[in-house]
Curated annotation (Swiss-Prot):
Belongs to the AKAP95 family. GO terms for cellular component: nuclear matrix. Coiled coil: none annotated. This is Zinc finger protein 326. Probable transcriptional activator which may play a role in neuronal differentiation. Able to bind DNA and activate expression in vitro. It comes from Rattus norvegicus (Rat). Keywords: Activator, DNA-binding, Metal-binding, Nucleus, Repeat, Transcription, Transcription regulation, Zinc, Zinc-finger. Residues 11-22 have a biased composition (Polar residues). The gene is Znf326. Its main location: nucleus. Residues 1-22 are annotated as: Disordered. GO terms for molecular function: DNA binding; zinc ion binding. It is found in: Nucleus matrix. The keyword ATP-binding does not apply.
Length: 22
C-alpha cells in the first residue's frame, strides 16, 4: 500500500504516490 491504487485518501495518509483515482 501507499501507491494510490485502491484509496487515494488512504494512500495519501500512508505517504506514497497517491493519485486521485477516478
Amino acid at each position: 500500500q501507499g501507491y494510490g491504487f485502491n484509496e487515494p485518501e488512504q494512500t495519501r495518509n500512508q505517504g506514497g504516490s497517491s493519485w486521485e483515482a477516478p
